Design a protein with these regions (language model features):
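Detector for C-terminal structural segments
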Residues: 21-34, 51, 65-71, 244-247, ...
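Ligand-site clamp/hinge motif
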Residues: 132, 226, 254-300, 418-419, ...
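Gly/Pro-rich hinge or "lid" segments in bacterial periplasmic/extracellular proteins
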Residues: 81-86, 94-105, 109, 201-262, ...
């Protein structure tokens, strides 16, 4: 049995990547956002970011939500990272090189971060990492192999997201991560695993300062859950200076960071729940970056001389889960009909202002192994009606579509979809769910139809397809199950032969697309809206920014 299939869902509690805080009036936000303490207001040395939400937790084993992404990236480092290359569509930006490189170990163009060097055994069952010496945490403790071992042991013991990361890497037990020397650590698996290197580039596989964590957690909290939730304990470029949830987080650059002190001394990460307020603050020069804006707002900012706006293809996907355990979506022809009825191009133009592309596959189209050749659901109401007739639903049916009130695009998409379905006799009730409770609606899997937005952070076809379509995956919210797909995913996980993996990924995509577990919506672009004098932005597949990249 493949290690991919070992992660049994209940432990995994993955937050919706685009879940945002509930909106408040712009007038209430403005005084607060502009009240930046004078200690942080040094010209040119402070970066102010307007974001939908502050970090809910600093423990990446339990939280995947807006605001947490940037915090984790600032406070922690992993063993490896992808090499950076110029972005073809954004001349002033870079992006991670996630292409397959047959001449490199694991087929990946990587650079060392906490690891100085690394070796992948030809068997694909063992990876050895030599750590940089003299790397200090924000608490003054030196990085050792014990920190890496403790970090992964924590993942084993606490489960949650750790249950997924250990399983997807093929690790069966804590002893599979071994301290070979003070600065050498190895990862050992029973079957060849193609993610033994790639997994260490993931934003949510950082290394903790185990000395500090053990001291703070003590015997009552051996894995330092309470401490890590509210404090930094890492080897990253910044340390946490202040965290006031619902208001702001403040980060201070570390002069002793092994990669050199970042150009920006202080980062003030302000919570501004409404996108209109974030736009206003950027236009007025009160903030340097405005995150997660509506398409029309993005268009308007392109005419502001003091602002630079760039949109690039991203790993984001938005779709509608069609619950295969709730009639009539247990019928494959009904699911196919729902896709033929979806006016994809109208949505892209009317809602996204062309800042998105059609979702024509079941994994990010920028990832190796993606195939768009199996999408055949161009808008065709006659075809949709024909399939409903075939399914015995020719007279139509009633259903419910739940959407996130905190996501500015889901409601207009739902209204357009509702109108199209009405033409073939499908009455769709729209259920507006508050942002704070939306994720629970997704994970309960009780909704016949529900929006979902996500991005598989590891740019690998096996990782992506397993996450959403393995019948045992906790993130398979459509309850999709196909024995042949499970078999193909298991076979992908058990070989390091990239040609074999890509061939099986293609087979799996063909089956999945034909059986339509989702209504395929869009690939939204990633947008960076910032002051024109702010340089250095890099696009990451985790769809977050890294403070250390920026300079003026």
């Amino acid at each position: 049995m493949s290690s991919f299939r070992d992660f049994l869902g209940p432990k995994l509690n993955r937050r919706n990547m685009l879940q945002v805080a509930s909106a408040s009036a712009a007038a209430a936000v403005m005084p607060r956002i502009l009240n930046i303490p004078s200690a942080y207001a040094q010209a040119g040395s402070t970066l102010v970011i307007a974001a939908p939400a502050t970090p809910q937790s600093l423990d990446c084993n339990f939280d995947v939500s807006l605001g947490t992404f940037e915090a984790i990236a600032a406070l922690y480092d992993g063993l490896l990272g992808f090499e950076k290359i110029p972005d073809a569509q954004a001349p002033d930006a870079r992006r991670e090189d996630i292409a397959f490189h047959g001449d490199k170990p694991g087929g990946v163009n990587m650079v060392g971060k906490l690891a100085e060097s690394w070796e992948l055994d030809p068997s694909g069952k063992r990876a050895v990492f030599k750590l940089r010496q003299g790397v200090m945490s924000n608490w003054g403790n030196e990085l050792t192999a014990e920190d890496v071992r403790w970090t992964w042991n924590r993942a084993f013991e606490l489960g949650a997201l750790g249950a997924f990361y250990t399983a997807v890497t093929g690790l069966k037990k804590p002893d599979d991560v071994k301290v070979e020397d003070k600065y050498v650590v190895s990862f050992n698996v029973e079957e060849p695993n193609p993610l033994l290197l790639k997994i260490h580039t993931n934003l949510y596989t950082p290394v903790y300062d185990s000395v500090k964590c053990k001291a703070e957690g003590g015997t009552d909290d051996p894995w330092a859950r309470k401490f890590i939730e509210n404090n930094s304990a890492g080897f990253g470029p910044y340390q946490l200076q202040q965290l006031v949830r619902g208001q702001q987080a403040v980060f201070q650059a570390r002069a002793d960071y092994y990669g050199g002190k970042p150009a920006i001394d202080t980062v003030v990460f302000k919570e501004v729940p409404t996108s209109a307020s974030r736009v206003q603050l950027l236009q007025g020069g009160a903030v340097d970056i405005a995150q997660y804006l509506q398409p029309l707002e993005i268009i308007s900012l392109k005419n502001v001389p003091s602002v630079a706006v760039e949109t690039v293809p991203a790993s984001f996907m938005i779709w509608i889960e069609l619950n295969a355990k709730i009639a009539p979506f247990d019928n494959v022809d009904v699911r196919r009909a729902m896709n033929f009825a979806f006016p994809q191009q109208e949505v892209i133009k009317a809602v996204y202002q062309d800042l998105a592309s059609p979702l024509n596959g079941c994994m990010p189209n920028i990832y190796p192994g993606f195939s768009g050749e199996f999408y055949s659901y161009e808008h065709n109401l006659d075809k949709a009606k024909e399939l409903l007739d075939k399914a015995g639903m020719g007279s139509g049916f009633k259903s419910t579509l739940a959407y996130n009130a905190g996501d500015p695009v889901q409601e207009p998409i739902a209204i357009i979809y509702q109108s199209a379905l009405k033409k073939i006799g499908v009455e769709l009730e729209l259920k507006k769910v508050p942002a704070g409770s939306f994720y629970n609606f997704v994970t309960d899997r009780k909704q016949p139809m529900i929006f979902y937005v996500d991005s598989p952070w590891c740019p690998d076809p096996g990782y992506s397809l397993t996450l959403y379509f393995d019948s045992k995956s906790y993130v398979n919210y459509s309850n999709y199950a196909n024995a042949e797909v499970d078999k193909l995913l298991a076979e992908m996980a058990a070989t390091a032969d990239e040609n074999v993996r890509l061939a099986k990924a293609k087979e799996a995509q063909k089956i999945i697309m034909d059986e339509a577990p989702w209504t395929f919506v869009t690939y939204p672009n990633y947008t960076m809206a910032r002051k024109a004098d702010l340089k250095g932005w890099t696009y990451y597949t985790s769809n977050n920014i890294r403070f250390q990249d920026f300079s003026r």
